[in-house]
């Protein structure tokens, strides 16, 4: 009987909750890192503010910055607006959420992987 109660309680405690990051935390976590779904896309946040995205074999460049507790991406393309996201973290899992939009990007943070495109 005691074993059954522990089996139910332990998995619930092991699950980490996502929490929203502040500006200094965003900079510390993203600088020099890559966010990826490990299959289809990756977003690289270089130390010099350069942003590179790889998606389905297409490479795009731009700049990234942190403004008012949000991660902002400028794709340096007049056809794309700058986007700023709230950053939510749980372990190495990260979510980029836009205010007022329920769909968000989710992936992991890791050291950048070299790519040839």
Give the positions of each predicted feature.
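Lipid interaction determinants
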Residues: 9-63, 67-117
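Bacterial N-terminal signal peptides
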Residues: 1-7
């Amino acid at each position: 009987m005691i074993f059954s109660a522990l089996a139910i309680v332990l998995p619930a405690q092991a699950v980490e909750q996502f929490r929203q990051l502040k500006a200094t935390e965003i900079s510390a976590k993203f600088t020099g890192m890559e966010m990826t779904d490990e299959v289809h896309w990756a977003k690289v946040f270089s130390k010099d503010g350069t942003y590179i995205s790889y998606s389905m074999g297409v490479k795009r460049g731009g700049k990234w910055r942190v403004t008012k507790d949000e991660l902002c991406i400028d794709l340096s393309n007049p056809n794309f607006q700058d986007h700023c996201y709230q950053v939510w973290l749980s372990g190495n899992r990260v979510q980029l959420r836009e205010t007022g939009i329920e769909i968000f990007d989710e992936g992991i943070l890791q050291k950048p992987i070299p790519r040839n495109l």
